[in-house]
Design a protein with these regions (language model features):
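TPR/TPR-like (Sel1-like) alpha-helical repeat modules
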Residues: 90-108
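Boundary/linker segments of alpha-helical solenoid repeat arrays
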Residues: 67-69, 103-117
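Alpha-helical segment of the N-proximal tetratricopeptide repeat
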Residues: 35-51
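Residue-level signature for tetratricopeptide repeat
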Residues: 42-43, 76, 83
Length: 160
């Protein structure tokens, strides 16, 4: 088991990786991908959506390629959509959900950094598409939603 420490002006995060029991990723993923990406997955899968946003944003703000930047923006916005749902702001959640969908569409691929984007987006739509059914989602009763669980595919992708 390995610990991760992410430090920035806004974020200090230290916890052991691979602590989760659902095996969202492998040791090969830990070795291949940025620690902020893996940390964000742990946090997201734990329902810590704002903290997942912080971890992914730490990576996004660094020097990354254009595809990775777009992917991280989509992941950040999807996490923020669930954060807004948690705090009772469906209008803001809808805005973040729409932005995430746009970013995923611009990526133009079905797998990125071992995440099956088609599956993730299908789960995202199942959880949040109801937000698009009203002119003002604040007027709708909030259903019980389940955020997608992120589980990386076994193959390691080359990313920019």
């Amino acid at each position: 088991m390995r610990s991760v420490s992410i430090n920035s002006a806004r974020l200090v995060l230290v916890y052991p990786l691979m602590q989760q029991t659902d095996h969202a990723y492998t040791e090969a993923h830990i070795a291949a991908y940025p620690v902020e990406y893996i940390a964000g997955i742990d946090l997201y899968n734990s329902g810590e959506f704002h903290a997942a946003h912080d971890a992914w944003e730490e990576r996004w703000m660094g020097e990354v390629g254009p595809q990775e930047k777009l992917f991280l923006q989509a992941m950040i916005q999807s996490a923020v959509a669930f954060h807004h749902m948690d705090i009772g702001r469906p209008g803001a959640a809808r805005q973040m959900y729409q932005r995430a969908k746009e970013k995923f569409a611009k990526l133009g691929c079905s797998v990125f950094m071992s995440l099956d984007l088609d599956d993730y987006q299908a789960q995202l739509d199942a959880a949040l598409s109801w937000l698009l059914t009203a002119a003002d989602p604040r007027t709708l009763p909030m259903p019980e939603i389940r955020a997608p669980k992120i589980r990386l595919l076994p193959a390691i992708d080359v990313f920019d």
